[in-house]
């Protein structure tokens, strides 16, 4: 299955040109042989983040939406809340896997509030905003993304 993956970077301080983490994710997606369906940068605003997730899922028909940033403890970090507001079902194992993998790199990973949910047939995964942490999050789950994206679309389990 060829995946279409959208990137939504959540930041008050970056634009598309300065979005190093998003650019790194684009490279990783393409290296996997998948398609970048869209890539936007929005402010750390729950409404804007939610709208961008909805557009990526519903208009761009992304199988997966990766948000980047807004997952920490700052009062401006609202990506998990924005994700929850526009999605239907929790997929806790993916966020748990990212945290577990990231804990082998830095103990600060325990401070992440990142979540993973479904919006219809689209998987929405929160990644941290730093380039290093976004790459590590990708490493943690990339080998399972295709299967995870097939499941909501009616794909069966494989061993």
Model-based region annotation:
Residues 1-159:
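Non-catalytic beta/alpha edge segments that cap or flank active sites
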